[in-house]
Amino acid sequence: MSEVIISARDAQKISQISSQLPHALLVIADYGLDGLGVAQILAKNNDTFHLKPLPEKQTISIDQIRELISTLRTYAINRRVIVIDEADSMTEPSQNAFLKALEEPNKNTNFILVAKNPKLMLDTVRSRCQTLTLHKTTSAQDKKLLEKYNLDPASSQQILFLAAGRPLLIKELAENPEKFAEYRQLATDAKQILATNREYDTFKNLAKYFSDRQKAILLTDIIVNMIRFQALSRGMNSSLEGQLEKTTSVASALKSNANVRLALTQLVI
C-alpha cells in the first residue's frame, strides 16, 4: 500500500479509532483526501473485503449489496472488515438493503464506509455509523510531498495553489501533465470570473463546469482562495466581502448536492 498522507489533526483520532474499531464507521473525505487509504490503515491485519461502484454504472447496485449480505451470513472465525468505497454512490434501494447488515451486527464484522458527500446517504444509514471527517493537510505537508517530484518552482507553486491540502490531487497533478494543464485552466477561469463585470463572459466561463460537480467545487475553492489573497494584499472591502460570502455560499450548496448549474449561476446574479 502506498503512503497515506493525512492531516496531523486527524492522526490522533485515527489512532484512537484503530485501537477499538466501531461496528460501523463513516469516513468523510473531501475530493483529493485519502479516505480509502485511511480505511485500509484501520482495516490492517484483518480479513478485508472491498466493495466499490461498478465502472460501467458508477453506482453500487442492490445486487452488489445482496451479494455482500449473502457473504456475511457465513460464519467468520477471524475478524473481517468490509470497506465500502464511494459509499455515497449507493442507490437508495442499495442503502435500504444495506441497513439490514447494519441493524443485525455480527460481532466479528466491522464496516468502514468512505464517502465524499454523506448528504447523498440516507439518514438511517448515517445515524448507525460513527463519523470520522478528514481535514486538509498543512502547507508544510504539501510542500514535503511535492519535494519527491522533479518539478520547476513555478509548477510547484501552481500545484500547491490548485490542490492545497489535497494530497491525492497533488500527486495526480505532479504525475500527470495533461491533468495539470486541465487544472491550470481552472485557475485561469477563476481569475477571469473575478476580474470581469460582464455577466455574459462570466456565464460562459462557468458553463463548462455545469456537468462536473467536483470541478465546480474546486473552482469555487480557488475563487475563495483568490479573494482571501486579495484581501490580505489590499485589505478587505465591502466588494470583496460580498464576493467571498456569495462564493462560500455557492461552494456549500454544491457540496450539499444542489443543482450545479443553478448554484454556479448564483455567482453571476
Residue ranges and their predicted role:
Residues 96-113:
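Conserved catalytic/switch belt of AAA+ P-loop NTPases
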Residues 46-63, 121:
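AAA+/P-loop NTPase substrate/partner-engagement loops
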Residues 1-48, 108, 116-269:
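Charged, glycine-rich active-site and insertion segments that engage polyanionic ligands
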Residues 26, 81-83, 112:
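Structural motif
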Residues 83-84, 133:
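Short catalytic-loop micro-motif centered on adjacent basic/acidic residues
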Residues 12-17, 61-81, 89, 93-100:
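Conserved alpha-helical scaffold flanking the Walker A/P-loop in AAA+ ATPase domains
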Residues 86-90, 118:
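Conserved Walker B
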Residues 34, 56-57, 90:
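Glycine-/small-residue-rich active-site loops that bind phosphorylated ligands and cofactors
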